[in-house]
Amino acid sequence: MPDTTMEPTKAKKVLIIEDEGDMCLLLNILLNGKEMELDHVKNLSAAKEYLLNEQPSVVILDNKLPDGFGVDFISIIKNAYPAIKIIMISGYDGSAKDVALENGADIFLEKPFTRDQLYQSIKGLMN
C-alpha cells in the first residue's frame, strides 16, 4: 500500500548578509512566520564560508559591509552558485542600484523599504 502521509513542505532557506544588528533584527521580524528558514551572517568572509556548506534559495545582501561591498560580492555568488537569487539592499548610495543589477542582482531595494516590498520580492524569486 503506498504511503499517503504528507511530508511537511520544506521551508526555503534565505541568507541575510547584514552587519547592522538593528537591521538584521528588523529583517527577522519582517520575515518571521513566512514559511522560510532564515540564517544571517555579518560580513562577506562569513558569507563565503556559509555558502561552502549551504545553498540558500535567496540571499539578502547589504552593500556596505565591514570587509567589502556587497555589489562586488554579487558576481562571486552568481559565478559559483548561479541558482541563488540575490536581493541587494542599500540605504547609502542610490547609484549602487545600476552596479548591483549589472553584476547580477535580481532585485534592488533601497532602504527604507516596506514589509510587503521585501516579502513580495522574496516570494517572487522563490516561485
Predicted ranges, named:
Residues 18:
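Conserved acidic carboxylate
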Residues 21-39:
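Two-component/phosphorelay signaling modules centered on CheY-like receiver
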Residues 40-58:
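Acidic, metal-coordinating helix/loop segments flanking the phosphotransfer/catalytic sites
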Residues 43, 69-72:
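Acidic catalytic/metal-coordinating carboxylates
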Residues 62:
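Active-site residues of response regulator receiver
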Residues 72, 92-109:
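Alpha4 helix (beta4-alpha4-beta5 surface) of REC/receiver domains from two-component response regulators
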Residues 113-123:
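C-terminal output helix
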